[in-house]
């Protein structure tokens, strides 16, 4: 017959101790009580909740909007001479200038503050 091996405990069980202080047992469960309060959403008894219903403004009156809304664009905001083509040409010129400066400048794009042109 095979005998069963004895199992060894992995950890030594701590024996309960007598309370030295009145609140010692309460301190041991404080973490669980905090978790429970958070889970319940800090429900307070009704005597601690303030009722503001008598102070609030009863109703707001809506102001009707005009039938014809104001225009978003007028003659001052739109120019007939502006076009995407002129914007693209200006952009191409700026990009070409930047490319030329990076190729010809020995420092590349690195500069000191006293070398910056404003």
UniProtKB/Swiss-Prot annotation:
Instruction: Give UniProt keywords alphabetically.
Output: Cytoplasm, Nucleus
What InterPro entries would the database entry show?
RNR_inhibitor
Recorded GO cellular component terms are: cytoplasm; nucleus
What is its subcellular localisation?
A: Cytoplasm; Nucleus
- Keyword Cytoplasm part of the UniProt annotation: yes
Coiled coil region boundaries: none
* Taxonomic superkingdom: Eukaryota
Q: State the family it belongs to.
A: Belongs to the DIF1/spd1 family.
So what does this one do? Mediates the nuclear localization of the ribonucleotide reductase.
Name of protein: Damage-regulated import facilitator 1
Native organism? Zygosaccharomyces rouxii (strain ATCC 2623 / CBS 732 / NBRC 1130 / NCYC 568 / NRRL Y-229)
């Amino acid at each position: 017959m095979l005998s069963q091996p004895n199992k060894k405990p992995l950890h030594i069980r701590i024996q309960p101790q007598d309370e030295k202080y009145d609140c010692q047992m309460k301190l041991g469960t404080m973490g669980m009580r905090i978790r429970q309060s958070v889970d319940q959403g800090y429900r307070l008894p009704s005597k601690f909740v303030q009722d503001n219903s008598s102070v609030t403004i009863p109703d707001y009156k809506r102001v009707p909007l005009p039938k014809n809304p104001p225009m978003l664009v007028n003659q001052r905001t739109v120019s007939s001479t502006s076009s995407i083509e002129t914007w693209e040409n200006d952009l191409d010129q700026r990009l070409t200038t930047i490319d030329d400066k990076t190729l010809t400048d020995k420092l590349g794009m690195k500069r000191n503050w006293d070398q910056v042109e404003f």
